[in-house]
Amino acid sequence: MLTKNLLPMSIYLLADDVYDFPSANLATTDGLLAIGGDLSPERLIIAYSSGIFPWYSEDEPILWWSLDPRMVMKPTELKITKSLRKTIDSNKFSCSIDTNFDRVIEMCANVERKDQDGTWICSDMIAAYKELHRLGFAHSVETYYDNELVGGLYGVSIGSVFCGESMFHTRTDASKVALNHLCEFLIKNNFDIIDVQQDTPHFRRMGAYTIPRKDFLKLLKCYIKHPSLVGNWGDGSATWKQVVIK
């Protein structure tokens, strides 16, 4: 059961035992759609398949968002500057996939960033995405320098869509190198799009762009019908599965 009368501005209150979401098109002008529920794997998969994602602070209830416009990126259109290409070609960094998910998400939560006070990746979020990784739906890319983890990213994969969640670096360009490695993997495996979610200057420089939410939802509806690459992407054990969204 979904209830909207308890909250202002038509923000929906999610029931604990029902995983349905209201249409993403019903979100407020700033993108907030619903409040409550939980971070169970079932609810998260339904959310991402519906163009919705959780984003909240430790001292807040779970908040669910669907932004308009939506930032996306095609893996084939990643922009690599000459200096970054030189860094990649130098092989001073090495990359892997799904070899250290727990550490990547913990670093994303803990590494300080400019113009950001605290983190939205709270302990419950960390636990939830670790479980999604165990189930084969959440994935990480790791960047190493002299065997030290210095950058990385993580996100959720459904159909031919990769939903990027967060990235970090402790050494210049390490997260960009991770993004390049991700795009190479996605291209090889015929992924169509990366859901960047929020419009940021950093990702615009990397080749991302915004589209109206209604257009994003149309693309998403098509792309999630494709088989999902479920499992560990790094050890060759992942298999293509048709994920049925109930």
Report the location of each language-model feature.
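N-acyltransferase acceptor-side catalytic subdomain
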Residues: 1-246
